[in-house]
């Protein structure tokens, strides 16, 4: 199958009376190929193989790649913790005041794991052509929250 025409796909999907599903799941694909979450979030080839395994096994109207809310934060300089079988998380606060915000530089596309996520997306789009491929990325407010460590303010704390 050649390149998918998204306008046609959207039109056909709207006109079709059948309910479609687009599961946003990647962990089962990681397990299917015998890899760890750490493998998938640090290696674009493994990431793609997990998505491909899901597409081969389960029907879905679209393929979704891993949306890792730490990729962009890492590219900006945040420290990331990588548990073997859990999603990565930001450790601590990168931004503490307005001066730190003003000093931020827009990261290059080769910073942190961005290149691996681009690789996973390119491989998925090139090889999974029977359905749309939906890439995930963090929004500006979520990114700001991770750089400023807003979890500090939203997590329960012990009472005195």
Model-derived segments and their meaning:
Residues 87-123:
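A gly/proline- and charged-residue-enriched helix-loop-helix capping module
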Residues 40-47, 106-113, 155:
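Residue-level preference for long, well-ordered alpha-helices that form the structural scaffold
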């Amino acid at each position: 199958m050649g390149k998918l025409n998204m306008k046609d796909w959207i039109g056909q999907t709207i006109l079709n009376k059948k309910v479609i599903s687009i599961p946003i799941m990647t962990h089962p694909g990681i397990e299917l190929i015998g890899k760890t979450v750490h493998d998938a979030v640090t290696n674009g080839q493994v990431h793609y193989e997990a998505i491909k395994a899901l597409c081969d096994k389960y029907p879905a109207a679209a393929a979704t790649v891993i949306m890792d809310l730490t990729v962009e934060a890492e590219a900006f300089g945040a420290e990331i913790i990588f548990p073997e079988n859990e999603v990565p998380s930001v450790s601590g606060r990168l931004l503490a005041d307005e001066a730190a915000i003003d000093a931020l530089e827009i990261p290059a596309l080769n910073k942190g794991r961005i290149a691996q996520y681009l690789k996973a997306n390119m491989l998925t789009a090139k090889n999974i052509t029977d359905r749309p491929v939906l890439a995930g990325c963090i929004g500006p407010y979520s990114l700001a929250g991770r750089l400023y460590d807003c979890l500090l303010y939203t997590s329960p704390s012990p009472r005195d």
